[in-house]
């Protein structure tokens, strides 16, 4: 009898954990942009603009390849203020869409501009997919956005 109870408890636990992996509610809209392979230099290349009405938190997810070269930098700026400057480690094509970087960021009221660059005097080949989710949908100025990057389920 004890063995039966242990098996039932284990089965309940396994089924309960499996249920936790399924989304139970909508997270709202997602903004996503896929940049094809391009050469970066010291001049920042804008890849995505996200206008918001008021400051809000969001989850940033990105994956990239630099053909195993160091030096590419991901920037997030708003009205001349640098909100994020992340030097990207060398990454191979095999890591693209397999390894994702995830972190919470703050989007400031106004235009939040994501861009990429390489060190001065160097060029780095880069491909990136970037997405934002878990943000306050009401703060997003969708009419000022490229509709191709906004995914609303």
Task: Name these PLM-found stretches.
Residues 21-23:
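Bacterial signal peptide processing site
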Residues 70-86, 130:
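Short, surface-exposed beta-strand/strand-loop-strand elements in extracellular ectodomains
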